[in-house]
């Protein structure tokens, strides 16, 4: 999809960009694959804020996505490419030969009318899902499982992809979108191709109101708070932090401080850490 720019007719329009949605083929989602989505506004079951800067925004319905891709041996045809308000990637509606309909994350260059397949014997073709051990070295993949049968958890955002680098015993070596190189069980499934909507990262929201439509609330600087609310707070006027390093609102060091557990069980699967 192309990026659409606006003339600076107002301060809010100046610099604002939007996607032209030229790849989207319908604005009517499949009703059987919709579920209600209640707003949590970043609160947990006690009503406490566990994720800051969330709340409000346009009402949404959840699209039920097939992350498992476990419909083996049954061909499916792409019926539509649709917008999904709950993720950065677009989604594709697949009509299978047995009459079932499912949504999948739409890979780059997937078009209406194309046929896709899942299973160990599927061809190496965009949109096909198969175990990593059956995918040739050098292939770009997305929607990767970490545990067989659990469903894809890695590489699902718009424009992302991972690359199969090699095979070692029952494990496959994959370079993820972050630059991390890790081993994943060969039985875990992945989908061939890159995730579509790669222009998403170039969109400039442009104004605060548009962020609120998306359910994003303001981010307040710690230095303008009171000491009771933030370690950077207090003082007269524009006071310095007054600490050795910047802190999170909960008093932990930030900006470069490592928060990963020292003895994480998954360390043995990571060959190279992600790029900083």
UniProtKB/Swiss-Prot annotation:
The subunit structure is: Part of the 50S ribosomal subunit. Forms a bridge to the 30S subunit in the 70S ribosome.
Name the encoding gene, please: rplB
What name does this protein carry?
Large ribosomal subunit protein uL2
UniProt feature coiled coil, ranges: none
Q: Does the keyword RNA-binding apply?
A: yes
Can you list the disulfide-bonded cysteine pairs? Answer: none
- Renumbered residue ranges of the record's region Disordered: 224-276
Q: Which domain of life is it from?
A: Bacteria
Basic residues: bias regions: 258-276
Q: What Gene3D superfamilies does its record include?
A: 2.30.30.30, Nucleic acid-binding proteins, Ribosomal protein L2, domain 3
Q: Which GO terms describe its molecular function?
A: rRNA binding; structural constituent of ribosome; transferase activity
Pfam families linked: Ribosomal_L2 (PF00181), Ribosomal_L2_C (PF03947)
